[in-house]
Amino acid sequence: MFSKFTSILQHAVEALAPSLPLQEDFVYHWKAITHYYIETSDDKAPVTDTNIPSHLEQMLDILVQEENERESGETGPCMEYLLHHKILETLYTLGKADCPPGMKQQVLVFYTKLLGRIRQPLLPHINVHRPVQKLIRLCGEVLATPTENEEIQFLCIVCAKLKQDPYLVNFFLENKMKSLASKGVPNVISEDTLKGQDSLSTDTGQSRQPEELSGATGMEQTELEDEPPHQMDHLSTSLDNLSVTSLPEASVVCPNQDYNLVNSLLNLTRSPDGRIAVKACEGLMLLVSLPEPAAAKCLTQSTCLCELLTDRLASLYKALPQSVDPLDIETVEAINWGLDSYSHKEDASAFPGKRALISFLSWFDYCDQLIKEAQKTAAVALAKAVHERFFIGVMEPQLMQTSEMGILTSTALLHRIVRQVTSDVLLQEMVFFILGEQREPETLAEISRHPLRHRLIEHCDHISDEISIMTLRMFEHLLQKPNEHILYNLVLRNLEERNYTEYKPLCPEDKDVVENGLIAGAVDLEEDPLFTDISPENTLPNQEWLSSSPPATPDHPKNDGKTEVHKIVNSFLCLVPDDAKSSYHVEGTGYDTYLRDAHRQFRDYCAICLRWEWPGSPKALEKCNLEAAFFEGHFLKVLFDRMGRILDQPYDVNLQVTSVLSRLSLFPHPHIHEYLLDPYVNLAPGCRSLFSVIVRVVGDLMLRIQRIQDFTPKLLLVRKRLLGLEPEGPIIDHITLLEGVIVLEEFCKELAAIAFVKYHASSTP
């Protein structure tokens, strides 16, 4: 009480006293602080009971006032005094000793405000960056301390200054010659953390510092906000207390630099206070984005950042329940790291494991965004660490297990992170994890060369329909990602040589036929016994397609040798016989909807594939190795096999199989278009295409229709029930077959629309 009265009295005296020159006033306040340590006999009293906080605040105000009164870049006498007399070094020593109690907090506040409010560059000065380095080491020593908030504020302002002038980061890379394996663990970090912070508990052994930059005081100024951006009020406490799993013991000599700023931030990411942890994550994101190569190398090789990311991912993944409903995993709201506040009591859609799932997805989003923002070499190193330590080390065993419930949950989680990833570098590693790096054509004997790829593709035809659907969904979303290797690995590498075709050199008579719009050797569908229902009345006129097409474009060029689009369109539309069609009995199920959707989706795919520089036309057959045995590849083999069983599979499975095939058909590659969408391609003996698979299904269907009484009325009733136009009633015989026929009809309409839209786009000048 007496000390507070003394402080108030001193303020009053200072206010009434005549104003001194700024430098004298500054020196007065500094000496008042030093005299306290000389004269005081009670070093147990808290610093808040002394005048020290007031004197520090006055010193700061004087420095700001001095800078405002001078020209930009000019160092005043007060700042010169602070630098020359190593005031920051002295304050660091007092803060480290925390004498009087609470002094560390006051020192952190002073450093933070000094760096934030002074506009001229201070960090290049050796008497600034050296004590700043030392103070950084004190941050995060012990978690949940009273100074945590001040520590993170200080670290964040340092990060902001480095973001403003990235070259300054070199001052914070310290030489370190000790072996990691021989070091003890400082008490700041738990046992599971990699060693390597030899200077956390002492300021001795300080590395050789770069000399003060000449002319630093004359550098061009850049305005920086007084305080770094803060969003703590609404940030969640969800970067939970899950401890990081045990890390391997280091057995090699650590690279010769230390990055204590990163180490301190890493410590604080483990804070029980979620707001502190989030701010530490923000600081790390600033640091990884710095363009300095030396900092990027040190970041990934001399700190445990890679281990922090991957081991926390592993911890959060392992904390998930053994079984989570795939629908819950798929539909849980979008997760943004740091904003995943969650209250089980307030959540009407809570389910077991939701808290753990949100925490995992939130941390995965942080890793994704961190890699997305990181300097190039740092991003690659971080992504490879996630690949090796999390994807392979944790996820792969779960995906390769034999328990159906485990397979379903792990595949649903893989599907979710495939949807969520946005970083190109992390996506690349995820693709290599799922598919492998192989680019040579597949052979049937080597389809299991990459075990995980083989297992996942096999799961597309699993005995469990749920597993099949979830795996197909995962591949469908994977195909929508902007990565060329995905489609090449799954499909294109097997179509490069076009050895699915049989090469027949054109004779003079054939050339005349081609000029009339037909392909030599192609089967005329009107003469095929499977298509006896084709007549001028039930084919779709070309004019009708044109009227339903995407927005008008300039006139198409004359026939360039392609099969005319209306023949291709009608080939798909007439595949299903009239007796098996039901869409024309129901309004709103016409092909025009497919045209609009196909146009939009094709445009999106073209935008994705533009940078891949695909050819505009198929590779010339003369240059193809047609003698090589053709294998469509494991992925298409499974899809074609499932397509061939469309009349005997559940409705939901059929929808997913046809959805993946239509996605593949949309890609603007000439070989994919030819193989999946050209009914007139001359298939080599023993080869099949999507069209030939459907033809076989239709042949089977026409035989089976004859054995089902009242087939057409039953088919129409099933369609209306699927559309919700009829209430559910008694079970209908042959329901699986009837639903399969409906999916088949809709799929053929969709393929016809895609073929038309792609032709329309390629014919536009």
From Swiss-Prot:
> Region (Disordered) spans which residues?
193-236, 532-561
Compositionally biased spans, kind Polar residues: 196-208, 535-550
| InterPro entries to which the protein is assigned, alphabetical | FHIP, FHIP_C, FHIP_KELAA_motif
- What family does this belong to? Belongs to the FHIP family.
Function (record text)? Required for proper functioning of the nervous system.
Database matches in PANTHER family:
FHF COMPLEX SUBUNIT HOOK INTERACTING PROTEIN 2A (PTHR21705:SF10), RAI16 PROTEIN-RELATED (PTHR21705)
* Protein name (database record): FHF complex subunit HOOK interacting protein 2A
Q: Which organism is it from?
A: Homo sapiens (Human)
